[in-house]
């Protein structure tokens, strides 16, 4: 809804164009600086990123994986750093492959006695990995295993041995967001299963069978394991995975099978006494960003209990308390990150800490790591305007251990907005650039506003950025290098909505988009735009829409349903659910949301397909995608681009060579960001 003062002709006439449209033809992608309206407030030094944490058992040493991002925001060179938690100089572990891209350490894990820190290291330019170990003094690491394939989720077992998830002869990195292997030869025959393996005498002994892909695992005190697993293609079949028990040398039994196609399971944890397994279950659109309710399984009886049924929050990670009598939950409750203690004996969870900051290293996982014997925890905290730092201490009473980013700020006003859409109270974030500060009234305007009206604020453009998933959420993260930063530096406001289908308001809210893609969630987003216009001086004539993955789909969909946006940028979108079903490498994720395959019920797929309504598009739209994206394959972008080209709608399509669903090459990320900004600037320029 537009506020009345926005119609003032004098005000509209005074708004300068950001850039003449002729300067940004569709075939030219200048740097963002060439067109930014205000001067960007770039930090004096890079924003250091902390990607993983591991505390030694005695709590005296914190290991981390960290690095500085490129100008595009990608952290391509990563280091392992050790710091005494009591303070003191940090030590960097010298990696044998050096400080080069793809020399990627991961899976930090301390031995039970704290004398060894083991980790996985990828060999640059290959899918081969190795296990190495150092000590608390960051001594030169020694190799424990060289492996022809991928290794993930390394961890020490209570007996001092190492376990890992291993994929022999892997033809790609683990995960559907990684670039897919070339689709050549006989289809469906090149299947590589990821298995639980134990390092013993310089080699791996497999503890899970060769016909199952194991996604996550946890050790049992008797030497066995529990984990989530499914047969066949690991990228595709996580959505039908079951909770299983594994006994060496490879026996598997089912402990829990999801009760419906719209229930996925993740984050299995074993209690200290080995009698109970806890896990997260709920509808999840992606492996990695877990979310749902907390469940408990009694191993003796097989009884399964939902411990958080009906909660208005989403459990994103869980672990047993050090005493084993409760679960420690990492939750998202609308705009707040919450750490809660949930008694296993029953009762309501007790909130240990709640904040509107983001907690934890990386983009998904627990809010903190801990050393039970020492009673100390460590976390990474950040907000939209405050950069990440590592903090240590008791939960909620942390103090900064690092100061690398101290002094770096970003002048943005972040507002958590809540608006009504149908029966839902939808939450989102509105980010206002430093140029949005309203003019200060003089004394006469302040004390006699009836006779001397205060100055009107300048209207500012706004980009709505729709998150992927859809089972995910926009959460606070420091605005360092990246697309959001470019928009704000250009003087644009940014709206980050969390429509129905998102995490943060309980399982019923996350399930509210089942068989309704593009309808209720789009209403939520459009009502969010209205709410932003009531909360800030947003220019309704210069609204943009963008998103990646499901956000890319919503962008393609929205321009077939409304002409409200002046321009749109669809990243890795989906234009036709019917053709998409047979093109992507993860089609199992669609059954939970559509209720049946496209071959059984094509109509439910057609009603949510942008291509069904493609002749309604009038919005200039840029489409981009990675060449080897198996989650949202390039033909979906090509189909949308082809349709708009035939219909005479201004459009541009870009396919980035060799990239998967998540782009990695800094030059591609930089091109995408600059291209996106230039697209909005071009189409905003003649809308003032």
Residue positions per predicted region:
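Beta-strand-rich domains and repeat architectures in extracellular enzymes and scaffolds
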Residues: 42-78
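A flexible loop/linker signature enriched in serine peptidases of the S9 family
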Residues: 66-79, 96-104, 120-132, 146-152, ...
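Serine-hydrolase catalytic core recognition
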Residues: 365-688
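Hydrophobic beta-strand positions that form the internal "hydrophobic ladder"
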Residues: 62, 114-117, 162-163, 225-226, ...
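Residue-level detector of Asp-centered blade-edge/turn motifs that repeat once per structural unit
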Residues: 57-58, 112-113, 157-159, 220-222, ...
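Short loop/turn segments that connect beta-strands within beta-propeller blades
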Residues: 84-88, 135-139, 199-203, 247-251, ...
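Blade-loop segments of beta-propeller domains
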Residues: 89-119
């Amino acid at each position: 809804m537009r506020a009345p003062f926005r119609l003032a002709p004098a005000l509209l006439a005074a708004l300068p164009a950001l850039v003449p449209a002729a300067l940004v033809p569709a075939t030219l992608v200048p740097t963002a600086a060439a067109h930014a309206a205000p001067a960007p407030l770039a930090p004096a030094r890079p924003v250091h990123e902390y990607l993983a944490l591991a505390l030694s058992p005695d709590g005296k040493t914190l290991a981390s994986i960290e690095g500085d991002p490129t100008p595009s925001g990608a952290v391509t060179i990563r280091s392992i750093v050790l710091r005494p938690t009591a303070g003191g100089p940090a030590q960097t572990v010298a990696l044998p492959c050096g400080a080069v891209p793809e020399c990627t350490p991961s899976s930090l894990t301390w031995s039970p006695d704290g004398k060894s820190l083991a980790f996985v290291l990828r060999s640059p330019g290959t899918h081969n990995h190795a296990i190495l170990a150092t000590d608390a003094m960051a001594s030169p690491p020694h190799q424990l295993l060289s492996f022809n394939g991928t290794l993930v989720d390394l961890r020490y077992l209570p007996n001092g041995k190492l376990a890992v998830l291993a994929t022999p002869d892997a033809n790609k990195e683990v995960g559907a967001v990684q670039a897919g292997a070339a689709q050549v030869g006989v289809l469906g025959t090149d299947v590589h299963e990821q298995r639980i393996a134990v390092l013993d005498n310089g080699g791996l002994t497999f503890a899970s069978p060769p016909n199952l892909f194991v996604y996550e695992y946890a050790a049992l005190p008797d030497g066995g394991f529990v984990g989530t697993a499914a047969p066949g293609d690991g990228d595709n079949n996580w959505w039908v995975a079951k909770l299983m028990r594994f006994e060496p040398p490879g026996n598997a039994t089912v402990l829990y099978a999801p009760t419906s196609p719209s229930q996925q399971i993740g984050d299995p944890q074993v209690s200290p006494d080995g009698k109970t397994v806890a896990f997260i279950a709920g509808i999840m659109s992606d492996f990695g960003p877990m979310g749902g309710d907390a469940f408990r399984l009694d191993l003796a009886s097989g009884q399964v209990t939902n411990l958080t049924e009906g909660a208005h929050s989403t459990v994103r990670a869980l672990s047993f308390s050090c005493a084993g009598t409760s679960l420690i939950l990492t939750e998202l409750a609308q705009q707040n990150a919450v750490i809660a203690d949930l008694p296993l004996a029953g009762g309501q969870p007790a909130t240990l800490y709640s904040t509107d900051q983001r907690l934890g290293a990386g983009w998904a996982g627990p809010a903190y790591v801990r050393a039970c014997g020492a009673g100390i925890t460590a976390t990474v905290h950040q907000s939209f305007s405050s950069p990440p730092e590592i903090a240590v201490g008791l939960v909620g009473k942390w103090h900064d251990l690092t100061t690398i980013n101290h002094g770096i700020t970003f002048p943005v006003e972040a507002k958590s907005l809540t608006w009504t859409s149908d029966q839902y109270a939808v939450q989102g974030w509105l980010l206002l650039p430093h140029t949005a500060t309203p003019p200060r009234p003089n004394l006469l305007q302040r004390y006699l506003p009836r006779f001397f009206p205060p100055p009107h604020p300048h209207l500012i453009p706004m980009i709505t950025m729709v998150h992927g998933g859809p089972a995910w959420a926009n959460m606070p993260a420091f605005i360092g290098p990246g697309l959001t930063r470019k928009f704000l530096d250009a003087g644009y406001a940014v709206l980050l909505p969390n429509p129905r289908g998102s995490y943060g308001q309980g399982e019923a809210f996350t399930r509210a988009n089942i068989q309704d893609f593009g309808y209720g969630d789009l209403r939520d987003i459009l009502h969010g735009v209205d709410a932003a216009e009531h909360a800030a001086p947003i220019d309704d004539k210069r609204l943009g829409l963008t998103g990646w993955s499901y956000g890319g789909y919503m962008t393609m969909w929205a321009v077939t349903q409304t002409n409200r946006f002046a321009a749109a940028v669809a990243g890795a979108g989906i234009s036709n659910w019917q053709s998409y079903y047979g093109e992507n490498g993860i089609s199992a994720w669609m059954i939970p949301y559509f209720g049946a395959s496209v071959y059984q019920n094509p109509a439910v797929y057609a009603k949510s397909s942008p291509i069904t309504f493609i002749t309604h598009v009038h919005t200039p739209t840029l489409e981009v995608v990675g060449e080897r994206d198996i989650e949202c394959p390039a033909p979906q972008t090509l189909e949308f681009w082809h349709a708009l080209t035939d219909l005479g709608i201004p459009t541009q399509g870009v396919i980035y060579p060799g990239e998967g669903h998540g782009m990695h090459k800094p030059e591609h990320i930089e091109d995408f960001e600059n291209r996106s900004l230039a697209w909005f600037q071009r189409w905003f320029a003649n809308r003032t």
